[in-house]
Swiss-Prot record:
The modification Phosphoserine is found at residue 208. The keyword Nucleus applies. Its main location: nucleus. GO terms for cellular component: nucleus. It is found in: Nucleus. This is Thiamine repressible genes regulatory protein thi1. Transcription factor that activates the nmt1 promoter. Regulation of thiamine repressible genes. Positively regulates conjugation during meiosis. The lineage of its organism: Eukaryota, Fungi, Dikarya, Ascomycota, Taphrinomycotina. Residues 676-695, 754-775 are annotated as: Disordered. One of its GO terms (biological process) is DNA-templated transcription. It holds the Pfam family Fungal_trans. One of its GO terms (molecular function) is DNA-binding transcription activator activity, RNA polymerase II-specific. Keywords: Activator, DNA-binding, Metal-binding, Nucleus, Phosphoprotein, Transcription, Transcription regulation, Zinc.
Length: 775
């Protein structure tokens, strides 16, 4: 017994010693760097080797320096082991989903691998059966648990199928787009009862109900007009001018108004107009409303180009407003039709109202256009053969135009967009030969460019304005990312969309100018966040200063383009982009003018006022915005100008420079260079401006030796006598024989009392001295 205890003690002692020996060894032999660094000669001599080729010792002895080859069994890195661990966990998780109750031990995995290697053609669905055969205990437990829950064979089979890993397809409902005989559409979402009934019909293999009987009234509702409605329609129809005038106004609309946004195809519109004019008994309220709005736009654009436009009653009495009022009166009848004409009418009315005093109502009509587009299913792609390829393309162009208006109105008003991008499944507009007008340039590439800019604008508003990051560094990262995407958009721009200032006669000159203005507006919207940071913190990085420079350059480019359009009579307040983008660039240029005041900025601001004055003379909204900008400009001017009405405050801001200036004058005896008026005058009281006046021009101060010019350069207004208000109370005289006064601190100058009391006391004393001397 004692021998066994002694053996155990010796063994425990040896184990403890071995453990201590392992702890003392700090670096394992296989990880020591010296193992492969020393050459064979240094190893044999047991001397230090520097690992060179050759080493210093071998080079000195002039012998061959040979190193032992490294072992190919490299030690696995820690990162690789961690990656293997993650891979193992992922594979175990995947296998557990396929075979939930399989025991993932090494011996079981080896067994199932051998079993699967015997039958390479075994399908995947049979793997679960093989695993159950290998693990009998698990299979028995599953059988007992299933019998405990339910003893029926069907439930046992369903449960075994679930355990086998067969994925059951989910139950889904699809949205539908019903098409009528006249290509009228009706959108039914996946939550509607019709979608549920259709799913039941498919599952029960029932015959589908005829859509002609089910949706005929909902697709093409028959509208019956009352006597009052018919009178409204007849009155609106009577306002249509002669055919020659109609053609002129229609061409003016499609050339000048419908540029980057699509409302109606010109060829189809003229064909529909001929049919409408030929049928006097039947009046289509939808097309009549669109026709009146097109004529109103054409008339207003023609009237805008006249130079003798009255600012007061431009929108009060003209033919365009009468046409617009007639279209607005029959618009409720258009809503009852619930077809594409409701979308087009709402869009045109909203565009027209933005240049009037009812600018806020225009956003409501834009919202109606969006809601009607969704109700008609314009945002969903349809495979129905009833819709021709041309009809699908026209619907796609109209929806994308509504989408762009929604995004840009969202940016202008600050509200969130109404159509989520995820809900739109239609493709981009494409060029179809049947829809192209011979001799005219296609606007499809312009539309695609504007659509991409609308998406980027929404991303800008979402990341920088609606959901801003609390950290400025994160905001700079967002600016960097968005700016990179804008540059990518610019590099991918089609050559026909690139704006050329010299190509004034190009058919898409105005459209390309608007695309460039939208791009510059996106740059301003992205980078003006950093411009606000500059007002708070002037120590910015070079990258942030570059972004501020880009902001100013974009605003400058917008005004130059707008002024170019104004010069060639292409600028219009009826254009959404031509109206809002110049006003968006105005605050940036005014801020740059008052902080930099360079000649280039002054020239651009001069063009800015010309553009805004033109828009304000033709638009009520622009007139109010211009007055607001003028007030902002006055505030900036008052902030940067010296406060001449408060000499104490002005003296506080420049007291230190003034002290150094007086000190330089006292040391250099500069008092003799000034003309002193007092005794040499007629003995009348003199103001400080008269008593202390330079004998020559103000520039002579710069030539005086020893004068501190920092004060002169920083405060140029102090050298101009006209900038100071004369004070009849403070009458001071300076004697030539007096020496310069010693410096006084600011507290000694003002004294412990109030500044106003001290100034009044000083004024009283000086007035008494003056009276005594004159008396």
């Amino acid at each position: 017994m004692n021998e066994e205890i002694g053996f155990l003690k010796n063994q425990l002692f040896a184990d403890v010693k071995d453990l201590e020996r392992k702890k003392k060894r700090r670096v394992p032999p296989e990880q020591r760097r010296r193992v492969f660094r020393a050459c064979k000669h240094c190893r044999q001599k047991k001397i230090k080797c520097n690992g060179g080729q050759p080493c210093i010792s071998c080079k000195t002895l002039n012998i061959e320096c040979v190193y032992a080859q490294k072992s190919q069994n490299k030690t696995l890195s820690r990162e690789y082991l961690e990656e293997l661990s993650e891979r193992q966990l992922c594979l175990e998780y995947i296998f557990s989903r396929m075979c939930p109750n399989f025991n993932l031990e090494t011996k079981n995995l080896i067994s199932i691998s051998k079993k699967l290697s015997e039958n390479e053609n075994l399908p995947v669905s049979k793997i679960a059966e093989v695993t159950n055969e290998l693990d009998t205990l698990v299979r028995i437990n599953d059988q007992l648990s299933r019998n405990h829950i339910s003893g029926t064979t069907e439930e046992m089979q369903s449960s075994s199928s679930l355990i086998a890993g067969e994925v059951q397809p989910g139950i889904s409902f699809r949205d539908q787009l019903k098409v009528g005989k006249l290509e009228d559409t009706l959108y039914l979402g996946p939550t509607t009862s019709e979608a549920f009934i259709e799913r039941l019909q498919n599952e029960l293999e029932l015959e589908s109900i005829s859509e002609d009987d089910l949706y005929s009234k909902r697709l093409s509702p028959s509208v019956s007009y009352s006597e009052f409605d018919e009178q409204l329609l007849l009155h609106a129809r009577s306002l249509i001018p002669s055919k020659a005038v109609v053609e002129f106004l229609i061409n003016s609309f499609f050339i000048n108004v419908q540029t980057n946004l699509f409302v109606y195809h010109p060829h189809f519109f003229k064909c529909r107009l001929e049919i409408f004019l030929a049928m006097e008994n039947q009046i289509d309220a939808g097309f009549l409303c669109i026709l009146l709005m097109v004529l109103a736009f054409g008339n207003q654009y023609t009237a805008e180009q006249q130079e003798d436009v009255s600012k007061s009653n431009f929108h009060a009495s003209n033919i365009g407003n009468r046409l617009f009022s007639a279209a607005l009166s029959i618009f409720p009848l258009v809503l009852l039709q619930s077809d594409v004409s409701a979308v087009q009418s709402s869009l045109l009315i909203g565009l027209y109202l933005q240049s009037t005093i009812y600018e806020k109502s225009s956003f409501a009509y834009f919202g109606l256009a969006i809601k009607f587009a969704v109700a008609l299913g314009l945002h969903k792609n349809s495979d129905d053969p009833s819709l021709t390829q041309n009809s699908k393309e026209l619907r796609n162009r109209l929806l994308w135009s509504v989408f762009c208006i929604d995004r840009f109105v969202s940016m202008t008003t600050g509200r969130r967009p109404s159509i989520p991008l995820e809900c739109i499944s239609i493709p981009y507009p494409v060029i179809l030969p049947d829809l192209e007008i011979p001799g005219s340039q296609s606007i499809v590439e312009n539309m695609r460019a504007v659509i991409n800019l609308a998406k980027l604008t929404n991303e800008i508003c979402d990341s920088l304005y609606w959901n801003p990051s609390p950290s400025f560094e994160s905001q700079v990262n967002s600016v960097r990312r968005i700016y990179a995407r804008l540059e990518l958009w610019k590099s991918d721009l089609h050559s026909s969309v690139v704006f050329d200032e010299s190509a004034v006669q190009h058919p898409l000159f105005r459209s390309n100018a608007h695309v460039q203005m939208i791009y510059d507006n996106a740059i301003m919207l992205t980078t003006r966040v950093i411009m606000v940071k500059k007002l708070k913190d002037k120590d910015l990085t070079a990258e942030n200063r570059r972004y501020i420079q880009l902001c100013v350059e974009s605003a400058t480019r917008v005004i130059n383009i707008a002024h170019l359009l104004l010069t060639h009579k292409c600028l219009s307040s009826l254009s959404f982009f031509g109206l809002h983008v110049p006003f968006a660039s105005a605050p940036i240029l005014l801020l740059s003018l008052h902080y930099e005041n360079s000649q280039d900025i002054q020239a651009v601001v001069t063009k800015l006022w010309q553009v805004l004055e033109f828009l304000s003379s033709r638009c009520e909204f622009a007139r109010e915005s211009l007055n607001y900008l003028k007030s902002f400009n006055k505030q900036l001017s008052r902030r940067n100008a010296p406060d001449i009405n408060n000499p104490i405050a002005d003296f506080q801001n420049s007291f230190q420079n003034w002290q150094s200036w007086v000190g330089d004058m006292s040391h250099g005896d500069m008092l003799s260079t000034f003309k002193l008026t007092g005794e040499s005058s007629n003995g009348s009281n003199s103001t400080p401006n008269e008593a202390f006046q330079p004998f020559d021009q103000t520039s002579s101060l710069y030539n005086v030796p020893g004068l501190n010019k920092s004060y002169v350069s920083n405060q140029p207004s102090l050298l101009t006598p006209e900038t100071f208000l004369p004070d009849p109370v403070l009458n001071l005289e300076v004697d030539k024989q007096w020496t310069a006064p010693t410096f006084l601190s600011w507290t000694e100058l003002l004294g412990p009392t109030n500044v106003s009391e001290q100034s009044s006391h000083t004024a009283e004393q000086t007035s008494n001295l003056t009276l005594e001397k004159n008396g």
